[in-house]
Amino acid sequence: MENLKKQVGIKAAEFVKSGMVVGLGTGSTAAYFVEELGRRVAEEQLEITGVTTSSVTSEQAKALGIPLASIDEVDYVDLTVDGADEIDSHLNGIKGGGAALLMEKIVATYSKDYIWIVDESKLSENLGSFKVPVEVITYGSEQLFKEFERAAYAPTWRLNEEGEKLITDMQHFIIDLHIAKIENPQKLADELDLMVGVVEHGLFNGMVKKVIVAGSDGVKIISQ
């Protein structure tokens, strides 16, 4: 599995050229993309500016010598490469397993090009086998949790290693929704967008046109 992740990370790095502002995703697969960019910066004199999507990715990029800027310091991002937790047949996706969904969606929104890199196990006909993360402000979060219970979304709190409610980089909580089959991802996204106290959710609908997939038959690119 790790070899597959590395393959797509290296493949995605081929789309990066000198002079680009590059969005650096978060997660185990995106880490291989960042690692390959670091190698190219050191060995090939690749000149880029990275915009990171989490504190974890920032630390990795700094250690690799990749110059960084915040999303507010650039006009736009040329290309963002990130992983995904589940992707349906229409290239809608669920992200946020690494608790970085808010920053990931902000960087993706201001990117000219956006690519996901995954192994074939992340592909599904319909979304729902992976939980839907919902980032919420701490105040009133228990009320939101009850709302999700009433909607039969089987909510659970995202916890840290100490068993306490996880605090995101943006100082929010995450409530994970466990919905067996999401028939209409956009309808669910619209519903969540209208809920007071919800900061962002992990449904990334219609945001990517290209997915790089590694599987038993090699690396392929799926385009929409």
UniProtKB/Swiss-Prot annotation:
Keyword hit for Isomerase: yes
Pathway: Carbohydrate degradation; pentose phosphate pathway; D-ribose 5-phosphate from D-ribulose 5-phosphate (non-oxidative stage): step 1/1
InterPro entries reported in the protein's UniProt record: NagB/RpiA_transferase-like, Ribose-5P_isomerase, Ribose5P_isomerase_typA_subgr, Ribose5P_isomerase_type_A
Entry superkingdom: Bacteria
Reactions catalysed according to its record: aldehydo-D-ribose 5-phosphate = D-ribulose 5-phosphate
Catalytic residue positions: 104
GO biological process, one term: pentose-phosphate shunt, non-oxidative branch
Keyword field: Isomerase
Coiled-coil intervals, chain numbering: none
EC number: 5.3.1.6
Positions contributing to substrate binding: 26-29, 82-85, 95-98, 122
GO molecular function, one term: ribose-5-phosphate isomerase activity
HAMAP family: Rib_5P_isom_A
Function: Catalyzes the reversible conversion of ribose-5-phosphate to ribulose 5-phosphate.
Alphabetized NCBIfam families for the sequence: PRK00702.1, rpiA
Subunit structure: Homodimer.
The family this protein is said to belong to: Belongs to the ribose 5-phosphate isomerase family.
Protein name: Ribose-5-phosphate isomerase A
Source organism (scientific name): Lactococcus lactis subsp. cremoris (strain MG1363)
Lineage, opening ranks: Bacteria, Bacillati, Bacillota, Bacilli, Lactobacillales
